[in-house]
């Protein structure tokens, strides 16, 4: 721990995540499953634990049952050594209101800071995908003399309305000159006009300065009690806010390719794209870095199994993540992420999709560019993600980019003849993962083209039984 400072970490995990609906209809945003085996909150807590910060409180509020359960099962620390990951719900400790914002959540939980008596408080969000050594940020914070430090990452200019925007002091690149939360627009960086400096939602504070700022905020009438919207501007106005450049952070086992990976997965499209990042031949974010592991609750399900189906077709998975307990029985999975205990039946196809725990895919069904939440049963011959109007008519969400989303336990009607024919015609779709590989790696284009030709030939053979597939 740098400079022998005592550090308390606070994870803000009370968000509703409206932009991730319907995945957040029954759970808090940080509890949304990710990458087959994890929950979103696992990335924040793993980064803190790997940074050797082992006194962690998680502030929860919205539909927190599954989040609380996950924390209690996955994050058991050695309390005899004074270490803990504690889930703390809104308790109305100050007045009769629940948490009114991220700053108010900490204000209502000031007893946690008083009890721990830290020198430094690290405050992090719970819904981003990245690796970060917070000890390096704390070290800069202490040496800089700032009272508050904000972690910053470069983002495309058209995303300025989604983040807190940081302007650095021209005479001191580690000092914040201005901070605006989610402006309609902002100038680009001098070094790269196509980008701006965005807040990552991760902060380091001198503990006494944070407590004082929270008391000031609590007395104000013109506040939303928000860390980014109110507390950070308070420190900026005092001339006491610093910035930490995320590109300086060095993670053991990382490469230049993945070292500065950071994704806000707060929308359906960004959540989907982050999954597709993982299954590419050379993923931008490497889940397999054992020197900075991402921890989670370990499944008790048996290993995945690939077996022949009833008609002797071979169960296969290509360019995919397949988790414990998955059984692919004569079906084909390509460019997809399958969580625990998914079942894929004979002659079915799962393409460019994300399937969460215990989804069952019936015989001959086709799923394309979809996110399907837990415990959904897809009947035989069903077509999902092939016809947006059909999907909407059945109550599924379809994004503007064409991602179809099914909520937990959502019922999928038995398909009619038109839908069965639609599924049958698309049993040999070429996955986006195959197309992307051809664009990303010219040296494998020939083999990728061969895969595409094989898919096309197989489709033609089914349409004309006398045709030959080579």
Curated annotation (Swiss-Prot):
Pathway it works in: Glycan biosynthesis; glycogen biosynthesis
Annotated function: Involved in the biosynthesis of ADP-glucose, a building block required for the elongation reactions to produce glycogen. Catalyzes the reaction between ATP and alpha-D-glucose 1-phosphate (G1P) to produce pyrophosphate and ADP-Glc.
Keyword flag Protease: no
HAMAP family in alphabetical order: GlgC
Species of origin: Pseudarthrobacter chlorophenolicus (strain ATCC 700700 / DSM 12829 / CIP 107037 / JCM 12360 / KCTC 9906 / NCIMB 13794 / A6)
InterPro entries linked: ADP-Glc_PPase, ADP_Glu_pyroP_CS, GlgC_bac, GlmU/GlgC-like_hexapep, NTP_transferase_dom, Nucleotide-diphossugar_trans, Trimer_LpxA-like_sf
Database matches in Pfam families: Hexapep_GlmU, NTP_transferase
Domain of life of the organism encoding this protein: Bacteria
Enzyme type, top EC level: transferase
GO molecular function: ATP binding; glucose-1-phosphate adenylyltransferase activity
One of the protein's GO biological processes: glycogen biosynthetic process
Residue numbers binding alpha-D-glucose 1-phosphate: 164, 181-182, 199
Catalytic activity line of the entry: alpha-D-glucose 1-phosphate + ATP + H(+) = ADP-alpha-D-glucose + diphosphate
Protein name: Glucose-1-phosphate adenylyltransferase
Keyword Nucleotidyltransferase assigned: yes
């Amino acid at each position: 721990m740098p400079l022998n400072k005592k550090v308390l970490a606070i994870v803000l995990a009370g968000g509703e995540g409206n932009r991730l609906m319907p995945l957040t209809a029954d759970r808090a945003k940080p509890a949304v499953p990710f990458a087959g085996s994890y929950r979103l909150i696992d990335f924040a807590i793993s980064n803190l634990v790997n940074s050797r910060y082992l006194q962690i409180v998680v502030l929860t509020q919205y539909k927190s049952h599954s989040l609380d359960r996950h924390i209690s099962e996955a994050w058991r620390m050695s309390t005899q050594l004074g270490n803990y990951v504690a889930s703390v719900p809104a308790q109305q400790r100050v007045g009769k209101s629940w948490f009114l914002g991220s700053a108010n959540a900490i204000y209502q939980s000031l007893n946690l800071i008083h009890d721990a008596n830290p020198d430094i408080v690290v405050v992090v969000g719970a819904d981003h995908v990245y690796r970060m050594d917070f000890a390096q940020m704390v070290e800069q914070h202490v040496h800089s003399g700032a009272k508050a430090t904000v972690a910053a990452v470069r983002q495309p200019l058209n995303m300025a309305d989604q983040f807190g925007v940081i302007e650095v002091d021209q005479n001191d690149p580690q000092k914040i000159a201005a901070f605006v939360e989610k402006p309609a627009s902002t100038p680009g960086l001098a070094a790269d006009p196509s980008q701006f400096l965005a807040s990552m939602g991760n902060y380091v504070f001198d503990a006494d300065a944070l407590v004082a700022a929270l008391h000031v905020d609590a007395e104000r009438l013109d506040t939303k009690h928000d860390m980014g919207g109110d507390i950070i501007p308070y420190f900026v106005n005092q001339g006491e806010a610093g910035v930490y450049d995320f590109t300086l952070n060095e993670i053991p086992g990382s490469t230049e390719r993945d070292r500065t990976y950071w994704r806000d997965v707060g929308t359906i499209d960004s959540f989907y794209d982050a999954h597709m990042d993982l299954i590419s031949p050379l993923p931008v974010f490497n889940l397999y870095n054992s020197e900075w592991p991402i921890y989670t609750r370990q499944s008790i399900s048996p290993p995945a199994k690939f077996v022949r189906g009833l008609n002797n077709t071979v169960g296969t998975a290509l360019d995919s993540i397949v988790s414990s307990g998955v059984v692919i029985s004569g079906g084909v999975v390509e460019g997809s992420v399958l969580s625990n205990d998914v079942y894929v039946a004979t002659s079915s196809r799962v393409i460019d999709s994300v399937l969460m725990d215990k989804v069952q895919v019936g015989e001959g069904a086709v799923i394309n560019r979809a996110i399907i939440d837990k415990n959904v049963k897809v009947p035989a011959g069903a077509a999902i993600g092939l016809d947006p109007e059909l999907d909407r008519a059945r109550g599924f969400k379809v994004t503007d980019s064409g991602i179809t989303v099914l909520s937990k336990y959502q019922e999928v009607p038995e398909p009619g003849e038109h839908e069965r024919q639609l599924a049958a015609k698309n049993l040999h779709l070429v996955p986006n993962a195959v197309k992307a590989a051809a664009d990303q790696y010219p040296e494998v284009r020939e083999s990728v083209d061969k895969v595409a030709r094989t898919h096309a030939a197989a489709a033609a053979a089914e349409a004309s039984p006398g045709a030959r597939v080579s």
